[in-house]
A protein has these predicted regions:
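Glycine-rich phosphate-binding/hydrolytic loop that grips phosphoryl groups
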Residues: 9, 53-57, 159-179
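Acidic-glycine-rich active-site phosphate/pyrophosphate-binding loop
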Residues: 24-35, 85-92, 138-153
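Adenine-nucleotide phosphate-binding core of ATP-dependent small-molecule kinases
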Residues: 90-123, 163
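Conserved phosphate-binding catalytic cores of ATP/NTP-utilizing and phosphoryl-transfer enzymes
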Residues: 1-41, 169-176
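Glycine-rich phosphate-binding loops at beta-strand->alpha-helix junctions
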Residues: 124, 128-151, 162-166
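Glycine-rich phosphate-binding loop plus the immediately following alpha-helix
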Residues: 36-79, 86, 172
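Short, surface-exposed connector motifs at secondary-structure boundaries
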Residues: 15, 38, 103, 125-131, ...
């Protein structure tokens, strides 16, 4: 059973409707179209980790804060532009902002907006069918969800267990269940 199938099954179990599932994981980002409880199509990011949860973890570390602190900072900031497409170059850009005395809140907000923008561009390439649902670790950040909703121009739903959608889908597949 593929990772895509697991996320599709888990997303369907959590959201219960045809939708576009966006999974922002630690190493990649997936946009998955689910219809009739089946994966119909998907697209994964083709760049480095700059549009993933790992990117945010690296940047939080660079700012010297935990992920919870990072999101709290981001919610209070005015986003600075983070334009580099590569994690290494983006980290250099963040270091430059720190060196220039920019507020950590503004840097954190810029990082979240950068990731949300990359995810939105992946969605544009794939296309969105139906409602949009977010899974993966970033679904725990209300600020990321709101930012992604703004980038997409439509609401993005999440679920308290959305970070576990892949594991849930794997369990459903292992049980031989099909909706």
């Amino acid at each position: 059973v593929t990772e895509i199938t697991c996320h599709g099954k888990g997303g369907w179990a959590l959201f219960g409707r045809d939708c576009t599932i966006i999974d922002v994981g630690g190493q990649d980002t997936k946009v998955i179209t689910v219809a009739g409880a089946q994966v119909k199509d998907f697209l994964m990011n083709d760049k480095c980790a700059a549009g993933t949860g790992k990117f945010i973890e690296v940047m939080a570390s660079r700012l010297g804060v935990s992920l919870a602190e990072f999101y709290a900072l981001a919610e209070q900031g005015a986003p600075l532009a983070i334009s580099a497409m590569c994690t290494v170059f983006a980290e250099s850009e963040v270091i430059s902002h720190i060196g220039a005395g920019e507020r950590r809140e503004d840097i954190a907000a810029g990082i979240v907006h950068s990731v949300a923008g990359r995810v939105a561009r992946l969605c544009e390439r794939h296309g969105i069918t139906g409602d949009v649902a977010l899974t993966g670790g970033l679904c725990d950040s209300r600020y990321f969800i709101a930012t992604l909703s703004g980038e997409l121009g439509r609401p993005v739903a999440s679920h308290p267990f959305a970070r576990y959608a892949g594991a849930l889908g794997a369990a459903i597949a292992a049980a031989g269940k099909d909706f």
